[in-house]
Amino acid sequence: MTVLTIEEMAATLAPGQAIAGLDLGTKTIGLSMSDLGRRFATPRPVIRRAKFTIDAQALLDFAAKERVAGFVIGLPMNMDGSAGPRVQATRAFVRNMEEKTALPFVYWDERLSTVAAERTLLEMDVSRAKRAERIDSAAASFILQGALDRLSLLARSDGDEFSA
């Protein structure tokens, strides 16, 4: 497993490979998947957190089933840009995954992704109970969509035939 920049991931992905977005919480791991063209992020059901070995296996099972080529994981920076305790927990999770998979990870600044996801669910008139169930995967979609938009921009600047 390798931690890459988004630019490095862009260089390693083959056309038609999907990537997954992760929003690592204390109780759940929010999941989202890109389409094969890597244009759209779609929320997927969360993984309920237990202990690391169980969480890791559930994530690896998801990755195998969905043929994931890499992960974009939200890095919960403080608003001032400093790293808080959740950043440390996220980095520790990725370090621990190093022993479990060769799939690459990209850290993505997730500031305000949960706020944006909550606002979107409110605008869709989703009930409070349903919002609680869906917020982490919606946040994972916001994280992944940001990375997909960056990948699209990189592809256009490189003259890639698959760019929008």
UniProtKB/Swiss-Prot annotation:
SMART domains: YqgFc (SM00732). The keyword Nuclease applies. It is an enzyme of class 3 (hydrolase). It comes from the Bacteria. It is found in: Cytoplasm. Keywords: Cytoplasm, Hydrolase, Nuclease, Ribosome biogenesis. NCBIfam families: RNAse_H_YqgF (TIGR00250). This is Putative pre-16S rRNA nuclease. It comes from Rhizobium etli (strain CIAT 652).
